[in-house]
């Protein structure tokens, strides 16, 4: 597998565009991804009991059609908690886009992100849609889906399947309300592989638990967010089938793209200065390892310690202890940046200057060794700063 300098439109047969329609005052806020032919599609959606109208529309269409031609997205207005009118507006958003592309409405996915409780300004949407073009600027799409993010989040890779080259690309947004299960973000992945929707869903479902569901910024789960994958077969490879070496290769490709997007989201948490990675190793099973890792990275006390560049092993061990996992914790090793701070559940002395250098970096890795098995799990998050409170205190409702 090779990482390339690409966009969401790098896979064959895809294009994208983004622009400023007026959902936000100045920044880009409207865009689409278009496949030149019907693409296999798979999705995972928020687990919040309050589900935004666009998710209802998209989830229904994915289940009904099993194929997709385009995804249209606005940012600035979430169209969540907007009742019957909000649902009607989401369907209208889908229908207008379908009319413009000359396809059936169920072939269109819709997504919205932004302020909850506001109806979509439909004149703004209609005006923006009239200006979107096929084969537009894919980098502008990556900008158009952002809310409080400080940077775009994209990744693109290629892999060979026999004599054919398959390209996969991803783009995401997410900065606050990040505690997916699956939730709190928008992620879109395009691919030109020949793979059915059912097989694509299998690959997505298998990998979401190890990637997007292992990030946390603030523990809040959004009403709006989802991950959609489209694969249109333009690479002309032999169909990828389950339980084959080709499926395993495709799954690893998808896992890499999803993991890179997840890390970019965690690193861009609201007010964040540092990316935190927690590796739990030698656990009795992978699920326990992932639960412990997410417990540590989600701890507000651990987050604030990392912000203050304090190697507070006590907070880390406490988060391990309340993770809800029945694993002995009387023989735990904890390393920060590879430097031991606890061995066999007892603190050890360490070089203060070496630790200071580790804690001062913009990425901090915490390793928890349980000595209870051979499985591992990883989670990602960010530190918790003064700016997080400031950003969310000033955010408009």
UniProtKB/Swiss-Prot annotation:
The record marks 183-184 as: Cleavage. Substrate binds at residues 147, 173, 184, 270, 392, 397. One of its GO terms (cellular component) is cytoplasm. It is an enzyme of class 2 (transferase). Keywords: Acyltransferase, Amino-acid biosynthesis, Arginine biosynthesis, Autocatalytic cleavage, Cytoplasm, Multifunctional enzyme, Transferase. The record marks 113-114 as: Involved in the stabilization of negative charge on the oxyanion by the formation of the oxyanion hole. The keyword Acyltransferase applies. Its EC number is 2.3.1.35, 2.3.1.1. Pathway: Amino-acid biosynthesis; L-arginine biosynthesis; L-ornithine and N-acetyl-L-glutamate from L-glutamate and N(2)-acetyl-L-ornithine (cyclic): step 1/1; Amino-acid biosynthesis; L-arginine biosynthesis; N(2)-acetyl-L-ornithine from L-glutamate: step 1/4. Catalyzes two activities which are involved in the cyclic version of arginine biosynthesis: the synthesis of N-acetylglutamate from glutamate and acetyl-CoA as the acetyl donor, and of ornithine by transacetylation between N(2)-acetylornithine and glutamate. Heterotetramer of two alpha and two beta chains. This is Arginine biosynthesis bifunctional protein ArgJ. It comes from Streptococcus thermophilus (strain ATCC BAA-250 / LMG 18311).
């Amino acid at each position: 597998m090779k990482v390339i300098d690409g966009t969401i439109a790098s896979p064959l047969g895809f294009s994208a565009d983004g622009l400023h329609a007026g959902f936000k005052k100045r920044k880009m806020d409207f865009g689409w991804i278009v496949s030149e032919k019907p693409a296999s599609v798979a999705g995972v959606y928020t687990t919040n009991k309050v589900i935004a109208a666009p998710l209802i529309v998209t989830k229904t269409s994915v289940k009904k059609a099993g194929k997709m031609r385009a995804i249209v997205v606005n940012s600035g207005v979430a169209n969540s908690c907007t009742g019957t009118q909000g649902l009607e507006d989401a369907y209208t958003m889908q229908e207008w886009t379908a009319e413009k592309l000359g396809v059936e409405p169920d072939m269109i996915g819709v997504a919205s992100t932004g302020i909850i409780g506001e109806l979509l300004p439909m004149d703004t949407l209609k005006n923006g849609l009239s200006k979107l073009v096929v084969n537009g600027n894919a980098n502008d799409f990556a900008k158009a889906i952002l809310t409080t993010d400080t940077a775009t989040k994209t990744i693109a890779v290629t892999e060979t399947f026999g004599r054919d080259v398959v390209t996969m690309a991803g783009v995401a947004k997410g900065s606050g309300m990040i505690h997916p299960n699956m939730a709190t973000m928008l992620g879109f992945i395009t691919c030109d592989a020949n793979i059915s929707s059912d097989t694509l869903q299998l690959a997505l479902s298998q990998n979401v638990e190890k990637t997007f569901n292992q990030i946390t910024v603030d523990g809040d789960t959004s009403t709006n967010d989802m991950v959609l994958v489209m694969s249109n077969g333009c690479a002309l490879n032999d169909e990828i089938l389950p339980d084959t070496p080709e499926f395993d290769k495709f799954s690893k490709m998808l896992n890499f793209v999803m993991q890179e997007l997840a890390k970019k989201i965690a690193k861009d948490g609201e007010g964040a200065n540092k990316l935190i990675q927690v590796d739990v190793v030698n656990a009795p099973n992978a699920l326990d390892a992932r639960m412990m890792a997410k417990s540590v990275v989600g701890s507000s006390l651990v987050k604030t310690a990392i912000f203050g560049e304090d190697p507070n092993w006590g907070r880390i061990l406490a988060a391990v202890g309340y993770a809800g996992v029945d694993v002995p914790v009387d023989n735990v090793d904890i390393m920060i940046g590879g430097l031991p701070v606890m061995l066999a559940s007892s603190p050890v002395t360490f070089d203060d200057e070496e630790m200071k250098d580790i804690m001062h970096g913009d990425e901090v890795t915490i390793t928890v060794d349980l000595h209870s098995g051979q499985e591992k799990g990883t989670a990602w998050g960010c530190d918790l700063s003064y700016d997080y409170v400031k950003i969310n205190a000033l955010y408009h409702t």
